[in-house]
């Protein structure tokens, strides 16, 4: 049975406590944690996992994945990725989500990334984890675009974190058209709505944009997807809305997905 989580990144400018409290208040039982340098740094992957355990227990939440995006074209990015994998192994989180160029949208080049991804994938495999590369940036702008890169990587521990809004933001393709091409490689899904087109940052609550979530869920069900879903809302970027508005958007998103049979 798929688990529906709230993504802590939806509370980007707020503390870990505020994010977890808001996710729980909005009715979620699961969470995707965030340890993204320079963006949403709720988890200290060099610190004691007990800190996060106590926080999750306080709000009655279980972690299903962690976002640890870093620039995997660089040694520093690899080192952060390895630190996230080690933390996830200690904590017991099975999926580490990341992106080739980290959070920032940079011009990506394949060869530097290929020099490091094998090391990260081997570490994840040894730890019994999966590295899920997000639909994000240039080299993985869509599922269709990502397939040759995934084939070149050719590692069983490397899967896809499919973002239903990023695919349109970076490639112009619609999730319901692109997802069937890559559904069998998906290990994690960011359920994110969009009101904009290519290059437009406008990611509202689920149901307020034009992503066809009924179709998205049907495609993944038909593909036998059993992994987690994480609701991610990034609004119109910074500055983030007031905390109560973020929590309400997460609650409304959960209700919208319940109408499609996901709760």
Where are these regions (language model features)?
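Histidine-acidic metal/acid-base catalytic patches
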Residues: 1-29, 53, 57-60, 92, ...
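Structural motif corresponding to the early beta-alpha repeats
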Residues: 28-29, 33-116, 125-130, 221, ...
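Conserved anion-binding
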Residues: 134, 138
